[in-house]
Amino acid sequence: MLLGCAQLLGERTLLITQDELQGKLATMFPLQRKVLEVFNFTVDTPTVTLLPESGRVATHLGVTIQDRLQGREYRGAMEISFALRFDAKGMALRLKDVSVDSIHIDGISAKTQRALSQLGPMIAHDKLEGQMIYGFKPEDLARADGLGYTVGAIDVTPQGLSIRLIAKP
């Protein structure tokens, strides 16, 4: 009976605004990762920009790198962009197709900067691909599930992330 309700009511949309997404991300940072057992990366809270024309989200991240071998610290910034996928089992939005659009670290040589720019995409894929960006509480989606809805497409709009709820097949 409830499945019929979803089919009669049609598609629904859940909107996560840019501010809500920014707030959710703020709770996950700073983020620390070791790379090659030589570098400690600390990533500050990102600034989110929605890219509706490409269906992606961009973030500007402040970065601190500690070189454990030389005992030096470097600061800089990184721009990444990504698409999103819904993980039904984990009830979360996760990063997919992560791209490092630019990386600049102050105080390093041009040669090291080039090497870091080449390593950046590999590091981003290894450390960020599939990373949860937004988690839902069970009750967030329980009502939709009870009415016969499931998560469909995720669209990036100027207003935020538009998550389509569609009738279950």
Question: How does the language model describe each region?
Answer:
Residues 1-3:
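Sec-dependent bacterial lipoprotein signal peptides
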Residues 5-169:
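Extracellular/lumenal and peripheral-membrane lipid-interaction modules
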